Swiss-Prot record:
Ranges for domain Protein kinase: 38-324
SUPFAM superfamilies cross-referenced by the UniProt entry: Protein kinase-like (PK-like)
Regulation: Activated by tyrosine and threonine phosphorylation.
Family indicated by similarity: Belongs to the protein kinase superfamily. CMGC Ser/Thr protein kinase family. MAP kinase subfamily.
UniProt entry tagged with the keyword Ribonucleoprotein: no
Organism per entry: Nicotiana tabacum (Common tobacco)
EC primary class: transferase
Gene giving rise to this polypeptide: NTF6
Residue positions of motif TXY: 196-198
Disulfide pairings: none
Name of the protein: Mitogen-activated protein kinase homolog NTF6
Location of Phosphotyrosine modifications: Y198
Assigned EC number: 2.7.11.24
């Protein structure tokens, strides 16, 4: 797959701390990494958290992506998100999940303010591909979906919900290999604080989250996969709601109004009343609304995009669906050896506690003691 070509910048580094570290000025952002990471250093992405640059590990000759999270411990929620991402990705080992290669420790522990996480380098993400003029065949859609489900099967087997699956969190390389990234919102079970913790993209959010359910299951990720599948096919978001109310309206416009038997997951009387008072919309099969789309792809999407989470297809059954028959191989779809332990979330961690835990995670990559 091709990505937009970016003009290369010549970014020179200044050695620091007796040459053990090098500092780069990347578009006004200071990047200080150990000297084993060598140029060319190039910016490859920017987000709310900071900047991502690519570099080469001189010891392994491997190209890597380095994410700098500036002032990582200023805000406890952000710091916990960083810790969660590091712990989860260190626990997981799967071809379709991005790998952490290193955590760059600062030269001085007392000045540990920025976190640099080193990942394997990918070329682009699914959001960029969908937006591009790159032709996408049925084979592309099948292969991307298969890899997403294969990775998600592993995630769910670790008793983890991703909770923020969307095209920009699915990284790709030139071979069309797909890897799930950004586990900062992942949880083992539902938590009420999710609703206020982050303004995550609502377009891929399941009805139970839009309706403030505090109990939800792995089915929330399956809903997101259904949205992503249809976006791959149509090259535009399926439910681009401006706000929660419009988001729910777009869902019902496509799926039809839910029956009473579909609302068992709603514990709140207010939520149930709200849904029941919405204008009634008849249900039409997807094949009527999308007559030019592969019937098998539509059938799978319809099984994912079900209002009642209990009736949504599971990741195992989705992998076994006829749309993916040419790729599905049960013995090549591993599960996680042990469930992920979220116990560290339960403690009321201070910013300094989180800093200590991230420092300890960094030590696992380079146990050589530094002050």
């Amino acid at each position: 797959m091709e990505n937009e070509t970016n003009e290369k910048l010549e970014i020179k580094g200044i050695p620091t701390h007796e040459g053990k570290y090098v500092e780069y000025n990347v578009l006004g952002n200071f990047f200080e990494v150990t000297s084993k990471y060598i140029p060319p250093i190039q910016p490859v992405g920017r987000g709310a958290y900071g900047m991502v640059c690519c570099a080469t590990n001189s010891e392994t000759k491997e190209e890597v992506a380095i994410k700098k999270i500036g002032n990582a411990f200023e805000n406890r929620i952000d710091a916990k998100r960083t810790l969660r991402e590091i712990k989860l990705l260190s626990h997981m080992d799967h071809e379709n999940i991005i790998k952490i290669k290193d955590i760059v420790r600062p030269p001085d522990r007392e000045e540990f303010n920025d976190v640099y996480i080193v990942y394997e380098l990918m070329d682009t993400d699914l959001h960029q591909i969908i937006r591009s003029s790159q032709a996408l065949t049925d084979d592309h859609c099948q292969y991307f979906l298969y890899q997403l489900l294969r990775g998600l099967k592993y995630v769910h087997s670790a008793n983890v919900l991703h909770r923020d699956l969307k095209p920009s969190n699915l990284l790709l390389n030139a071979n069309c290999d797909l890897k799930i990234c950004d586990f900062g919102l992942a949880r083992t079970t539902s938590e009420a604080d999710f609703m206020t913790e982050y303004v995550v993209t609502r377009w891929y959010r399941a009805p139970e989250l839009l309706l403030n359910c505090t109990e939800y299951t792995a089915a929330i990720d399956i809903w997101s996969v259904g949205c992503i599948l249809m976006e791959l096919i149509k090259r535009e978001p399926l439910f681009p709601g401006r706000d929660y109310a419009q988001q729910l309206g777009l869902i019902i416009a496509l799926l039809g109004s839910p029956e009473d038997s579909d609302l068992g997951f709603l514990r709140s009387d207010n939520a149930r009343k709200y849904v029941k008072h919405l204008p009634r919309v008849p249900r039409h099969p997807f094949s009527q609304k999308f007559p030019d789309v592969s019937p098998l792809a539509l059938d799978l999407a319809e099984r994912m995009l079900v209002f009642d989470p209990a009736k949504r297809i599971t990741v195992e059954d989705a992998l076994n669906h006829p749309f993916l028959i040419s790729l599905h191989e049960i013995n090549e779809e591993p599960v996680c050896d042990s469930p992920f332990n979220f116990d560290f979330e339960q403690a009321s961690l201070s910013e300094d506690d989180i800093k200590e835990l991230i420092w300890n995670e960094a030590l696992k990559f380079d146990p050589n003691t530094m002050k």
